[in-house]
Amino acid sequence: MSNILQNRRSSFSSSTKSSLAKRQAPSSSENSVKLMPAMTKKRAPLSNITNQKIASRLQNSDSVHCSNKSAKLKIAPSVCVNASFSSNLQQSIVPHKVASSPSKSDDGSVSMDETRSSSDSYKSPQVEYIENDDVSAVVSIERKALSNLFITPNSETIDNYCSRDVLSDMKKMDKNQIVNIDSNNGDPQLCATFACDIYKHLRASEAKKRPDVDYMERVQKDVNSSMRGILVDWLIEVSEEYRLVPETLYLTVNYIDRYLSGNVISRQKLQLLGVACMMIAAKYEEICAPQVEEFCYITDNTYLKDEVLDMESDVLNYLKFEMTAPTTKCFLRRFVRAAHGVHEAPLMQLECMANYIAELSLLEYTMLSHSPSLVAASAIFLAKYILDPTRRPWNSTLQHYTQYKAMELRGCVKDLQRLCSTAHGSTLPAVREKYSQHKYKFVAKKFCPSVIPQEFFNNS
């Protein structure tokens, strides 16, 4: 297995570090949709646990290049435009995905008054419209909307959890007091009125959307935990190069584990499952999700477009289209806010450290035994301890909002501490390299103490 890991890292490194090729924009010449010159042959990043490159099948495919985004991980261009449209590109530069104007027919003739714009054709004659240059009217409407903005009053929840009447009198945080992190009701995006209800719903839902903790031993025959780690490590690099939001990565791993919990898969299809799950998660979370051709591209065209789409369909149907799943990142966002306190400036280093620890947990199959909320709370505990080993990392505010006592975190914190301590010698360096950058405050280079005092786990 060590040879597999070494081969995988050297292969991936050569494909993504020294010879990372960016896709080029289509040319406006007569050969605008012709394939660009063949690039140097690269082995698929996960070729040692996947099937061989399907170069022979690709020679017969009519796929051509596209320039949607540029990403270092890509090794070959993606498909965007059908070659049959090449003759039309000389006369029209209209994007192929843009809907036709309602004022024009298929043959290009005008079907209504040419002086009337296509946008005007959608206007209802029964509604009075405000022109863009009527500034006073727009300002008046905005002022009226703001004056009528109403945020529902706070209400108590069951068992006085997050009771506003109790927290409203607590202004400062010490070992016996709780900071009200939901006091900023002036920002509607914080959903402060419903924050506690949302958290309770997430805690109830996480048990229903969790994968089996023993599926490797019980279900899988050709795939093991090491291969899973290699796949997740590669997907972390993919998400970083494509600049995907963290939620996409966490959902991707959740979909992979849930699918593997009930479906036997061969190692040749493991990378296919990974890119299909990432494509689903990207569609769910991203504003501009990568196209299916791009996911074929990042595998060095190991899989055809139809294969990725078929796997996507299999995953969606097996998961019954239940794509909303509470992940560690969902809980971590709120727990970081609780760790900061309402009156403290956001501590970027603490947030980066907690995110680093949480992403390390994605690589480890055994961490599935811990719930996402427990991993998030433990990541906050360990992050605070690493940044300041002299202070007790847990307090009443964190206990209140996470609903975990310090003693309940002990097992998970120990597992995360082990991951942090061995990260520098790990053969899966994607997370460490990611968080060794300046934009993440170099948190991966922080020293992780090997021992945490027992009294820090005593409930205060």
UniProtKB/Swiss-Prot annotation:
SMART domains: CYCLIN, Cyclin_C. Residues 10-19, 100-111 have a biased composition (Low complexity). CDD domains: CYCLIN_AtCycA-like_rpt2, CYCLIN_AtCycA_like_rpt1. Keywords: Cell cycle, Cell division, Cyclin. The keyword Cell cycle applies. It holds the Pfam family Cyclin_N. Residues 1-52, 95-126 are annotated as: Disordered. InterPro entries: Cyclin, Cyclin-like_dom, Cyclin-like_sf, Cyclin_A/B-like, Cyclin_C-dom, Cyclin_N, Cyclins_cyclin-box. GO terms for cellular component: cytoplasm; nucleus. GO terms for molecular function: cyclin-dependent protein serine/threonine kinase regulator activity. GO terms for biological process: cell division; mitotic cell cycle phase transition. It comes from the Eukaryota. Belongs to the cyclin family. Cyclin AB subfamily. Interacts with FZR2/CCS52A1, FZR1/CCS52A2 and FZR3/CCS52B. This is Cyclin-A1-1.
